[in-house]
Amino acid sequence: MDFQELKHTLYSAVISDTLDSMGYLNQVLSSGIRPLDDSMILCGLARVGIYMKIYHDDEKVNVYEHEIALIDSLQPNEVAVLLCHQHHEIAPWGELLSTRSQYLEAAGCLTDGSVRDVKRIRQMKFPVFAGNIGPLDSKHRGKLMWYDVPGKIHGVNVNSGDFIFGDVDGVVIVPQQITAEVVEKALQKVREENQVRGMLENGVSLAKAFEEHGIL
């Protein structure tokens, strides 16, 4: 897939509509997860990491071990999907992880936890979608226990290799096994919507445009 082309051509609504038409009705995350900037677009393949809330931190234990391993292993166009079970006191993402990920040409980060260093990340224009913003470190509060294992975010199943697309409207997760079909159909729907838009701009009635294309 040409992720740069998809990033500039697709949008979350058309992917959601495509999934609906195929019978996948629960692939959109709730509105609680937002981009750090409305212009950010998340487009890539998931790498899932699962955090566990902790109540005691032994200084002899490296709580960052698996987190570092996951981030350092990111490939171009991959999205770090960090699952904190909506514990907003866990902030798994910040400026330094963004810096490393951007160097690796990763596509961004998606988390239901918190993110910090927001000012710097916005300046970097690195796509980050998060459930909350806060200054807390994940140390003493959470630890990444597993990665590249099945997970769930806001009730939506997610696996490493799934296609992640997010924009100002929301985030959609496309299962890996249907990604190629969904992308093809979504691109076709974009072309059809462009035709309908042109018709409406030239005075064609909404009823006529819908009758001809079935798109609204």
Where are these regions (language model features)?
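Acidic and generally charged, gly/proline-rich low-complexity regions
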Residues: 163-166
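Feature captures the catalytic cores and cofactor-binding loops of soluble hydro-lyases/lyases
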Residues: 1-160, 174-216
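Channel- or pocket-lining gating/hinge segments that regulate access to a cavity or pore
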Residues: 170-172
